[in-house]
Amino acid sequence: MDFPSRFDVIVIGGGHAGTEAALASARMGVKTLLLTHNVETLGHMSCNPAIGGIGKSHLVKEIDALGGAMALATDKSGIQFRVLNNRKGPAVRATRAQADRAIYKAVVREILENQPNLWIFQQSCDDLIVEQDQVKGVVTQMGLRFFAESVVLTTGTFLGGLIHIGLQNHSGGRAGDPPSIALAHRMRELPLRVGRLKTGTPPRIDGRSVDFSVMTEQPGDTPIPVMSFMGNAEMHPRQVSCWITHTNARTHEIIASNLDRSPMYSGVIEGVGPRYCPSIEDKIHRFADKESHQVFIEPEGLNTHELYPNGISTSLPFDVQLELVRSIRGMENAHIVRPGYAIEYDYFDPRDLKYSLETKVIGGLFFAGQINGTTGYEEAGAQGLLAGTNAALRAQGRDSWCPRRDEAYIGVLVDDLITLGTQEPYRMFTSRAEYRLILREDNADLRLTEKGRELGLIDDLRWAAFCAKRDGIEREEQRLKSTWVRPNTEQGQAVVDKFGTPLSHEYSLLNLLARPEIDYAGLIEATGGEAIDPQVAEQVEIRTKYAGYIDRQQDEIARLRASEDTRLPVDIDYTTISGLSKEIQGKLSQTRPETLGQASRIPGVTPAAISLMLIHLKKRGAGRELEQSA
């Protein structure tokens, strides 16, 4: 057979996790196979047509900083861009983009098809080849065998997928796609903890049947933001508005009177749904005192009339869906193009994973995306990139890598998953990170791109752009530091006139910029400086104004890092540690944390227990620093 059967890395699944995993592995120079059940659905946005949002855009920027495709695909397909929390500090600002679903998918496919070292093959995976607790390859639906020392599973909602509309259900990976039944059975044979989760989607509406005149228009931002560090607004297609309407008492009455026909409330669905993206049934049940809920009407694309009514995800029967949709202002005559539905699927307890996202029990088998209990394109893409990177590192005989919690939201995501596990679909928020001021959207490249270059993820073009930005920041900060403004001079008076800030003595421009009332653009205008790259200017201003807070956070990180990175021996027997309660011994034995820091975040493990473990390690002489290569 001319088609190769042996690869370094095999990725199963072509969604957001799978595409980033395959691209990362191939960028690192290893021979990579991407197996997908349908080439036409590579990069498909299964749920809402949007990328980013609070916490999520930080992940997108980090994927981008490591050379991933999601941000650039968003810039090329985004039909509306907004910065959320714009009036708050830079740590919690977040970019969100509506994407043209068809363009996004086409861009991702183009990137995949033009990636060296990457083979794409359309076949479902039905079996894993495992020998002596090591993965050796996969078997496809038609019996083809492909071999690799590293396999990345990114199965999304396809493992044992069951679609519910009302009290009727049928097998499916998502609407229109078959589930992975054979692989689900095979996975349940492995010594891994498995559970069921649920997610859902709203009915899609024909925009020609909607009255926008009674809704509130929500235009995008001007100037238009960009998502990728390599992107620009000229990449964006035509920009459009979203619209806002609301449910009402009649809507809630329709839903409440039909809860007995809901698969969620009649006990048909066993899986737990996402807390932060609840169905409309959940909303009116959990928030019974609320008179209305917002519904965001989002366009699916520039060349379709289809709309996505964000906020009314439902699995109620179709007749109820039609009635509740038509009870909403502006949608009294709405035509439903596709019914909403819920889907149940298998996921595996992420506490059975290492930091590399490799399973603890099967060597070379990596998990990424919804199989780990997460929800969202961004969370999936971040895990996919990390799993693909570590699968490639394993193939190259190099140490694995995962950023720490103080280095990236990706690090927060992975640490939360493998330490705490999850009983419901996990979504990223900025509130999950202790070091938000350092882990900003705007500095993701400064935090991660150098590491990405070292790993082999960053091409020459991106590296040159990054170096120019980094060096530009250093030059401008030095210029501001060495440029002085004195009272009663032309420059000094210009500053006073511009900001109403009296100068009692001479100041460097850097000192002046640290003042809350002085902004960078105004300071340059007043003192006659030259315009510089906007990304450089943004970094200089943020770093200067928040320098004191950032320094304090860095000091805190340095203090904690010594114990945080102390590695726990793989063979440690917690029952031999004097003073540990049986409960804590059990928790530690079950989770098998890799570091003392990870152990400290296991619920129920007390600071006193950590001290006892540290004493035990010192006695053994086994404590050594983990350079995040577990």
UniProtKB/Swiss-Prot annotation:
Disulfide bonds: none
GO cellular component, one term: cytosol
UniProt binding sites for NAD(+): 273-287
Binding, FAD: G13, G14, G15, H16, A17, G18
Cofactor(s) of this protein: FAD
Gene Ontology MF terms: flavin adenine dinucleotide binding
Location of this chain's protein in the cell: Cytoplasm
Predominant location category: cytoplasm
Short name of any one Pfam family annotated for the protein: GIDA
Keywords: Cytoplasm, FAD, Flavoprotein, NAD, tRNA processing
NCBIfam families per the UniProt record, alphabetical: mnmG_gidA
Family indicated by similarity: Belongs to the MnmG family.
Function in brief: NAD-binding protein involved in the addition of a carboxymethylaminomethyl (cmnm) group at the wobble position (U34) of certain tRNAs, forming tRNA-cmnm(5)s(2)U34.
Oligomer status and interactors: Homodimer. Heterotetramer of two MnmE and two MnmG subunits.
The protein's name in its UniProt record: tRNA uridine 5-carboxymethylaminomethyl modification enzyme MnmG
